[in-house]
Design a protein with these regions (language model features):
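Active-site acidic catalytic loop and adjacent metal/ATP-binding pocket
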Residues: 44-82
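C-terminal catalytic region of ATP-dependent kinase domains
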Residues: 68-173
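Short, exposed beta-strand "edge-strand" segments with a Pro/Gly-rich flavor and a Y/T-containing core
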Residues: 14-20, 59, 144-150
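ATP-dependent phospho-/nucleotidyl transfer catalytic cores
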Residues: 2-49
Length: 173
């Protein structure tokens, strides 16, 4: 069940047009009586947010994260719909080389975009903006949980062992 379909709020009838903010998500989860473990759900949501930042997922909106429903109760579902990560539309290797050799272009892809679908002050926010602001306690806690678990050597080995992509793609990822 997508997040958009679980709400018990006054915005539920307008959910297709509604753009959630970080505070909205926390409030909606806290108010929902059908969620079995609210604190765990909020923690897992922000774990997902940190991983989305790491993989550059620009499409995590209310219809592509959700819940499993049993006996009219909800538990957060395993993460799904990660197809919009690692710059999937960037296939031109000359452009990849340009980005890799240009610090300003690299910095844009670290600090400015991709952006999260979740709104901050009425606009999409960069992951860097949210994480570095330390504004959301739940996000800070997720960063503390997730960061030590990221082993860059394992990730580099995984990428290096993908036979179907070029060396340029491997370097870019």
């Amino acid at each position: 069940v997508p997040f958009n379909d679980v709400g018990e709020s006054t915005i539920e009838s307008n959910k297709e047009k509604y753009h959630y903010s970080y505070s909205d998500i926390i409030d909606l989860l806290n108010k929902n009586k059908k969620i079995t473990n609210i604190d765990e759900t909020i923690s897992i949501f922000f774990d997902m947010f940190i991983i989305d930042a790491f993989i550059g997922n620009f499409d995590r909106h209310g219809a592509n994260w959700g819940f499993l429903k049993r006996n009219n109760k909800y538990i957060i579902a395993p993460v799904f719909d990660n197809g919009s990560c690692l710059f999937p539309n960037l296939t031109n290797e000359d452009e990849m080389i340009f980005i890799l050799n240009n610090q300003d272009e690299l910095n844009k892809r670290i600090f400015k975009f991709p952006t999260s679908q979740i709104k901050l002050n009425g606009r999409k926010s960069s992951y860097f903006e949210i994480i570095s602001s330390l504004r959301y306690k739940e996000c800070n806690e997720a960063l503390t949980r997730i960061f030590p678990r990221i082993n860059m050597n394992d990730i580099f080995n995984l990428i290096d062992n993908i036979e179907l992509i070029s060396q340029i793609h491997k370097q870019f990822y």
